[in-house]
Amino acid sequence: MALDKDIVGSIEFLEVIGLEGSTYLLKGPNGEQVKLNQSEINDEDELETGEEYSFFIYPNRSGELFATQNMPDITKDKYDFAKVLKTDRDGARVDVGLPREVLIPWEDLPKVKSLWPQTGDYVLVTLRIDRENQMFARLASETIVEKMFTPVYDDEKQNELIKARPYRLLRIGSFLLSKEGYKIFVHESERKEEPRLGEEVEVRIIGHNDRGELNGSFLPLAHERLDDDGQVIFDLLVEYEGELPFWDKSSPEAIKEVFNMSKGSFKRAIGHLYKHKIINIETGKISLTKKGWSRVEDK
């Protein structure tokens, strides 16, 4: 005979056998009792005793079986992105569309805690039920993503910026999945820092392989990358809220004191920044443009 947990995390037809106060009593396929709160009925009409209806089955925190007609986005057999509600020492708690949150245990998350998802991130998960009849969220494996991603076999996405979320983090690189279903790999040489699991990032497509998987980069195009002097100026602009009282006619002494570079190096650097529309140069000052600020947001 099947165990109770076989129906947990799945959609089943259950018979209504009674009503106690505001709670319906349902009969499971193995004779188990399942409770249904009236708030979890999606029709205004009352359910009829003796009739069968379709429900999603889940356990409360005590392991009691409950049902809902508000079908979740994720079941035992279905993967989707779930919103992270919060993280604590036990792991990350996600919203899968049920009256209660579901936990991704800490041991399933990255070993480096700074790479854990944060509140508002979305992680690719399914449901799993343990031997104690408790329900958890399970991160998608590479095998699962292989079955569900949308392949791209030409260069139509070349240099396109795509928003995606990491579902797997390795030292060699980051594996991401976009809303459109594109699978993207970013080698560690194509990033300055490792993104969090589930964090929304913008990745530039730089190629594809014969399996339809895309290769991406978090780095700007080569001609947009800043040299050392340009980076010094850019970082100071960010630190001082986007504006500095220097321009190409500032004194060499003042430039040396603040930027630790010659006036010639300073002029070349701000010329490069201006050419690529990262800064504006006005009388007596330089300031970040909207494009310049976007580089800060992309970090």
From Swiss-Prot:
Superkingdom to which the source organism belongs: Bacteria
Family the UniProt entry places it in: Belongs to the CvfB family.
InterPro entries named among the record's database cross-references: CvfB_fam, CvfB_S1_2nd, CvfB_S1_3rd, CvfB_S1_st, CvfB_WH, NA-bd_OB-fold, WH-like_DNA-bd_sf
Official protein name in the record: Conserved virulence factor B
